[in-house]
Amino acid sequence: MNKKTKIWLIAAAFLVVLGVVLFAAGMAAQNWDYGALGTGKNRTETYEIQGTFHKISIDSTISDIAFELSENGTCRLVCNGPAYIGFDAAAQENPLTVSETDEREWYEHIGIFIGTPKMTLYLPEAEYDALVIHEDTGDVSIPRDFRFKNMEIDASTGNIANYASVSDTMKITASTGDIRVEGVSTGALELSVSTGRVDVRDTMCGNLISNGSTGDLTLDNVIVAEKLTVERSTGDVGFDRCDAGEISVVTDTGDVRGSLCSEKVFLTRTDTGRVQIPQSVTGGVCRIETDTGDITISISE
């Protein structure tokens, strides 16, 4: 290594150390608040919503969506996020509609943006006819304080968590986000993902359909009155103390494992995987098919 190369290496190392020292000094001055690195301004806006409604429709691009039961019986929308995010909320005619818009000019997309915007909808009632949500990258969380007749949620990369019961149909679709449903009862439950994970716990429903490509499906204490239908490409399927009148599971490379609450007539097929199932001849039909995955099912005591 010649002298000139050594000088350049020493200079580069010095600049790296200097950058680290300056960064640490700057963050210490901000009490290590990484939000201070952002170039955009944040704001909190509250929208008072007048009118009577029984249906709710929300269209969001990047904001997380949360719901709360209003403590004073009024409806309002509280939004926290960058100043370039605009919101429109109105309930002059059923349904209540909430929409989000990005008000930036093209040159304002250049900058440092820290944190996730969030909208919280405070609702005066606990029961509504319908909830429809279209979400891109934000997360959606619905607490068990509410109950709906129908629910339809679709998201691209956001995660969806629902703890609210639905009397008729609950349909949730996500591309790369995860889906969690817990402690609910519903008529028909439809859950679809591309690469996300699906967790359903402590749930009762009339029918359950779950489709997915590479995401796993976990069912824990899920009771389906009629038919449980699962289709997966490479994801695993797990049951824990679950039951249904009829079960159909089809996967390509995923394993199917778990326990059921009652005996079934098992019809299984796997090309290269192993099969371990109870030798029962009574109960509803449980059909499980996989190409390279294992099949391991037991009957819980």
Spans of features found by a protein language model:
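Acidic (Asp/Glu) and glycine-rich low-complexity loops/linkers
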Residues: N2-E135, S141-A155, A161-A174, R180-S192, ...
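C-terminal amphipathic alpha-helical segment
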Residues: D216-T218, V224, D236-R241, E246
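Short, local alpha-helical segments
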Residues: V250-D252
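Acidic (E/D-rich), amphipathic helical modules within compact regulatory domains
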Residues: G196, G215
